[in-house]
Swiss-Prot record:
It is found in: Nucleus. One of its GO terms (biological process) is transcription by RNA polymerase II. It comes from the Eukaryota. Keywords: DNA-directed RNA polymerase, Nucleus, Transcription. It comes from Plasmodium chabaudi chabaudi. The keyword Nucleotidyltransferase does not apply. This is Probable DNA-directed RNA polymerase II subunit RPB11. The keyword Nucleus applies.
Length: 126
């Protein structure tokens, strides 16, 4: 018995590779003019939630949210209402902050693993 496939499911390559000439990030201004709406292609809830949480903690941001417009499209929209600051700069600063936090976490984890291995090497453990 075969498993039915989804006829509207995108090809795997479309979920991983940005087509030539397409932009990774696009910025629009909301109809009211008070929000920046960023569309980020080839990303999902993982990065969307991280960015939204970081923006919500930023005192220069009045409102931040994200959504995935359609479950079969590999893109997210991040909406930012800044307090008199450029939305592009706020997004960039917060993404760099997240990258620094992840880098610090990676280094700390690697150091702890190394210390654990050194400590347990004398006991004949892995």
């Amino acid at each position: 018995m075969s498993v039915p496939t989804l006829s509207n499911k995108p090809e795997n390559v479309d979920l991983l590779v940005l087509p030539h000439g397409e932009e990774k990030v696009k910025c629009q201004i909301s109809d009211k003019g008070d929000c920046n709406i960023f569309t980020i292609k080839l990303e999902d809830h993982t990065i969307g939630n991280l960015i939204k949480q970081s923006l919500c903690q930023d005192p220069k941001v009045t409102f931040a949210a994200y959504r995935q417009p359609h479950p079969l499209q590999n893109a997210i929209e991040i909406t930012i209402r800044p307090k008199g600051y450029a939305g592009v700069k706020l997004l960039s600063d917060n993404v760099h902050s997240i990258l620094n936090q992840v880098s610090t976490l990676r280094e700390t984890f690697a150091n702890r693993v190394q210390k654990y291995k050194e400590k347990n090497a004398y006991h004949g453990n892995r």
